[in-house]
Amino acid sequence: MNATASLSKAASLIADPSRSAMLWSLLGGESRPASELAMLANVSPQTASNHLRLLLDAGFLKAESAGRNRFFKLAAPTVGVALESLAAASSRESKLCDAAQISRR
């Protein structure tokens, strides 16, 4: 897969509000159970399971089993850095767009 296709796939995964909420809740480096991630994303456990599988398959997350529970965390610090960078860039872009709209009035 070339770089642009890889970037597009990653962006489409992050673009989903439920998945981005799950990823954002893991930025602190801790592991969270699927049930907690479902609650944080305001989705059913079944829906969360589907989202988590996609994030695992993409390499954004890793999972560890403890008893009957699976705990998820970011696969690498670079995932968190990328998420924070995207959030900062989109925030700056939003502020620039707001400023441009105000100056046109």
Kindly give the residue locations of the regions a language model identified.
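Short, hydrophobic-biased segments on the C-terminal half of alpha helices
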Residues: 52-53
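Short amphipathic alpha-helical segments, especially helix-boundary/capping motifs
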Residues: 10-11, 45, 59, 100
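N-terminal helix-turn-helix DNA-binding core of bacterial DNA-binding proteins
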Residues: 5-44, 70-77
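Beta-hairpin "wing" of winged helix-turn-helix
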Residues: 56-66, 70-73
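Amphipathic alpha-helical dimerization/coiled-coil segments
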Residues: 1-6, 28, 79-105
